[in-house]
């Protein structure tokens, strides 16, 4: 398991990411029950060079946004206010979700993936219509709260790019991780100055409390305890 140093320098190892991911998913399931749980997707048989350490990523999928509700949603609400989550997607008949022109449903998938080059988590996401057509970034920005768009425009630590998903080989959007190590390091040092180190189990929770806001996903404060 990672040492306190690996948290204080803002980076994670593969094992640390696995530990932090499971802790994040457990806390989310307990404190954010208006959403379906994040699931751990294991990576198997990738290449002969893969180490014996467990690898995988977190997945939260089929979050539904009804775009006609956008004007009615207060800015301090996250995506779950306009969302009916598919908690048991295998039992849901998607044909009943086909919207009218006035009530268009948009679906969102979110993946938290480990970046081996930056040694930090990266948020990948995509939006699509009920028919499967992908949403352009301009449309996605209209779906998320305006405060999320403002946060992205003012951000000095990230920006949105579109590139191939590292495991699905399809184009997804992602929040670039170029500044993640630095601000996580500052956050860790702040915790350290108060007499405590940021434990590995809170790494992803702390990270997502910032990153999630960019895409309109906020976490309950209880998850930070």
UniProtKB/Swiss-Prot annotation:
Molecular function terms, GO-annotated: ubiquitin activating enzyme activity; ubiquitin-like protein transferase activity
Key words, A-Z: Autophagy, Membrane, Plant defense, Transferase, Transmembrane, Transmembrane helix, Ubl conjugation pathway
Compartments in which it is found: Membrane
InterPro entries linked to this entry: Atg3/Atg10
Transmembrane annotation, as ranges: 200-217
Gene3D superfamilies in the cross-refs: 3.30.1460.50
Disrupted-gene phenotype: Mutant atg10-1 cannot form the ATG12-ATG5 conjugate and fails to accumulate autophagic bodies inside the vacuole. Plants are hypersensitive to nitrogen and carbon starvation and initiate senescence and programmed cell death (PCD) more quickly. Reduced anthocyanin levels under anthocyanin-inductive conditions. Development of spreading necrosis upon infection with the necrotrophic fungal pathogen, A.brassicicola, which is accompanied by the production of reactive oxygen intermediates and by enhanced hyphal growth. By contrast, in response to the virulent biotrophic phytopathogen, P.syringae pv.
Pfam families: Autophagy_act_C
EC class name: transferase
Topology within the bilayer: Single-pass membrane protein
Gene induction: Slightly induced upon B.cinerea infection.
UniProt-listed Enzyme Commission number(s): 2.3.2.-
GO BP field: autophagy; cellular pigment accumulation; cellular response to nitrogen starvation; defense response to bacterium; defense response to fungus; positive regulation of autophagosome assembly; response to carbon starvation
Family under the similarity heading: Belongs to the ATG10 family.
Functional description taken from the UniProt entry: E2-like enzyme involved in autophagy. Acts as an E2-like enzyme that catalyzes the conjugation of ATG12 to ATG5. The ATG12-ATG5 conjugates is required for the formation of autophagic vesicles and for the timely progression of senescence and programmed cell death (PCD). Likely serves as an ATG5-recognition molecule. Confers some resistance to nitrogen and carbon starvation. Is also involved in the formation of anthocyanic vacuolar inclusions (AVI).
Name the UniProt record assigns to this protein: Ubiquitin-like-conjugating enzyme ATG10
Organism listed in the record: Arabidopsis thaliana
């Amino acid at each position: 398991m990672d040492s306190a140093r690996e948290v204080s320098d803002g980076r994670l190892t593969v094992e640390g990411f696995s530990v932090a991911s499971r802790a994040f998913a457990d806390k989310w399931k307990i404190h954010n029950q208006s959403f379906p749980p994040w699931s751990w997707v294991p990576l198997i048989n990738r290449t002969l060079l893969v180490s014996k350490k467990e690898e995988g990523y977190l997945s939260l999928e089929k979050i539904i946004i009804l775009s006609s509700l956008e004007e009615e949603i207060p800015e301090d609400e996250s995506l779950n206010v306009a969302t009916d989550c598919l908690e048991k997607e295998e039992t849901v008949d998607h044909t009943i979700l086909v919207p009218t022109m006035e009530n268009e449903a948009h679906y969102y998938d979110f993946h938290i993936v480990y970046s081996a080059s930056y040694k930090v988590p990266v948020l990948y996401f995509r939006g699509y219509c009920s028919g499967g057509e992908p949403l352009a970034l301009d449309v996605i920005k209209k779906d998320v709260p305006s405060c999320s768009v403002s946060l992205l425009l003012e951000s000095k630590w990230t920006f949105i790019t579109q590139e191939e998903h590292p495991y699905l080989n399809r184009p997804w959007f992602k929040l670039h991780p170029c500044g993640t190590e630095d601000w996580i390091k500052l956050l860790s040092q702040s915790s350290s100055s108060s007499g405590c180190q940021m434990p590995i189990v809170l790494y992803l929770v702390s990270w997502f409390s910032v990153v999630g806001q960019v895409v309109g996903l906020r976490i309950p404060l209880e998850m930070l305890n």
